[in-house]
């Protein structure tokens, strides 16, 4: 057997061994992580090999106090899970076929999205006040609970509310309309009110343990930008705000990818005073949110209870828009 063939076989065996390692293996099983370090990591939300593999060196270094050691631990976790190995585009395609989707409850919007809101992705919903962003979030928190044959995932939701707009009464209306027990529907939603940007980010860290312990398939942050805009006003604070927002969005994306959950964030709009033709509004958050979100939807009001939603940024969807109505039962075609 040639040395090249031996090397190829060895690499294949290494990849196969990595695949067979459970990503939920306790973090203390990692090389270089004992009980003391393991306890420190768990206190900050790093419970498993997978948690560490998706972390940054800076994050772990702040916990264990040594950057070089943090790098070694992360490299060990990634090697254990085979994250250093290249795979074929065909394998990527096969993996994407396993992506789960949550129906929005609006057939035309599901078709526009290719089946609904994807797991392992961050979907951003942009719009003015009263455009229906929160209504859509409420409906998704109900829809995710439905069985798969009805467009759901038979799962629970986490709802982080930054503007005090969550209404359990609305959840109950939507649940009844879809044949769910209203009290049980509420019981399947883990709710938290975020009172500052720091609190909001801490809640996302805590969400990780809830996702691990419960059957959670949806995380909603409504709205992602509100506290950041109010706490960092003016150009002099813009760089600090964007740096902090960048970490927050990165944490959400890692959470979505690591635990196969759908993340939906809502975003506000801001006016461009120098625009005289076309739409003078643009999403808040700048390039951080533009690059951080996987899919971007724009909601706007039409006449009476009709709303129009447009997909304006996606890795593979064509641009398009559909309309829906907001009724007592929820969002419908």
Curated annotation (Swiss-Prot):
Xref: Gene3D superfamilies: 5' to 3' exonuclease, C-terminal subdomain, P-loop containing nucleotide triphosphate hydrolases
| PROSITE patterns in UniProt | RECA_2, RECA_3
State the SUPFAM superfamilies in the record. Answer: P-loop containing nucleoside triphosphate hydrolases (SSF52540), Rad51 N-terminal domain-like (SSF47794)
Instruction: List the InterPro entries hit by this protein, alphabetically.
Output: AAA+_ATPase, DNA_recomb/repair_Rad51_C, DNA_recomb/repair_RadA, DNA_recomb/repair_RecA-like, DNA_repair_Rad51/TF_NusA_a-hlx, P-loop_NTPase, RecA_ATP-bd, RecA_monomer-monomer_interface
Under Gene Ontology molecular function, one entry of this record is: ATP binding
Where do the annotations place ATP binding?
127-134
Provide the protein name: DNA repair and recombination protein RadA
Q: Which organism is it from?
A: Pyrobaculum arsenaticum (strain DSM 13514 / JCM 11321 / PZ6)
What's the gene?
A: radA
